[in-house]
Amino acid sequence: MPGLDDIRRAVSKLLKRSGPYENIVNEFIRDLQRALISADVNVRLVFNLTKRIRERALKEQPPPGLSRREWLVKLTYDELVKLFGGEYEPEVKPPYTPYVIMMVGVQGSGKTTTVGKLAKFYRGMGYRVGVVAADTYRPGAYEQLKQLADRAGAMFYGEPGSKDPVGIARRGVEELKQRGADIVIVDTAGRHGYGEEEALLDEMKRIAEAIKPDEVVLVIDAAMGQKSYDLAKRFHEATPVGSIIVTKMDGTAKGGGALSAVAATGARIKFIGTGEDIDEIEVFRPKRFVARLLGMGDLESLLEKIERLRGVEEFEKTVAEMMSGKITFRTIYKQLQQVTKLGPFRKILQMIPGISTMLESLDEAARLSEEKVKKWLTIMNSMTYEELDNPNLLEERSRVKRIAVGAGVEPSEVRELYNYYKSVKKMMRQLKKRKDLLERFARLGGV
């Protein structure tokens, strides 16, 4: 995540620094301040937070088993969790059915796309979901939501050409309930600028009165940064907002500012959008989020995602092989097959403890595309059993040339796969070295 990635780099630098401890603390505090301010976090919040970290790091003795640097990381973890909302677990499972969710937000926040993502998320949990296209303001909103509903496997209701958003919302909720929907998600219009915001808030009130939603969800673009504070308060005053979704966290340096600003209002962030694909939405849990920021990883989120797929046991077996250091091309083959189902490899790696701090030095080979994965699978299909079991045989040029001819690729592409194998093996070796540190953090309740 742009901006916030600098926090991970600050921690990585901290763990490598040498010299007097007070100097190390001061340098880390400066790096952390720069990272948070560049992420558009309120300057006053940043200086208060870093002041508390510095004072405790220099005055308090770390618990038995932790070095002073590790204690500094733990203090940073605790303060960032507070900054981004504290220790709470959002309840995403509806308390009863049918359950009506009304989506609100300004135009351009990614609201309609988020309706599709939510529909897909709840379909994945086994609920029957329906969506209502009540945005009559934006051209193309009806067609966009219809396509998203199809992709999500959700029921759809809309009235193309109608200019009566309140009536559409009321009739849509009634019909989808009759069709057996457990969850009904209503998309409403957004507006640009302060001049049109009053009209938006008035329409929002009228729709809420007509459909009596069980939950109102405010969608906020992460690029708003600190401005999210005022927006969240204005919407909440118009219609009580039950939860908030912060979108486009992958595309802006201001994500930290948006998250901290929303948390400062006391509102609960339930989900964050992490990409453009319909699957790229995740439950926002401050503790896990901060653990990933610091490079500690988020195994629980990763495991949740894996559980929604087939072949969980096979995946776990592959991960165990990789963690043990016994990596061959057979391991890489299985890993590439499975990761294509999970999403971009770098996003998966960021969830694994210890790996995210290494991504900066990871070879370009690890930046996988779907096209590259297919090509590499073809290359491995052209290898002998001996080569699959002993990748170092590819040091021989004659083997590289033979494999390239068999796969219909250039020798340089075979060497690229070999370099990828070496970078993964190196990464796993580094990860094993950090295992003790992670276990000690876990015992302290940090992750």
UniProtKB/Swiss-Prot annotation:
Main enzyme class: hydrolase
UniProt xrefs under InterPro entries: AAA+_ATPase, P-loop_NTPase, Signal_recog_part_SRP54_M_sf, Signal_recog_particl_SRP54_hlx, Signal_recog_particle_SRP54_M, SRP/SRP_N, SRP54, SRP54_GTPase_dom
Similarity comment text for this entry: Belongs to the GTP-binding SRP family. SRP54 subfamily.
Comment on protein domains: Composed of three domains: the N-terminal N domain, which is responsible for interactions with the ribosome, the central G domain, which binds GTP, and the C-terminal M domain, which binds the RNA and the signal sequence of the RNC.
Positions bound to GTP: 105-112, 187-191, 247-250
The protein, known as: Signal recognition particle 54 kDa protein
Chain's gene name: srp54
Catalytic activity: GTP + H2O = GDP + phosphate + H(+)
Organism: Hyperthermus butylicus (strain DSM 5456 / JCM 9403 / PLM1-5)
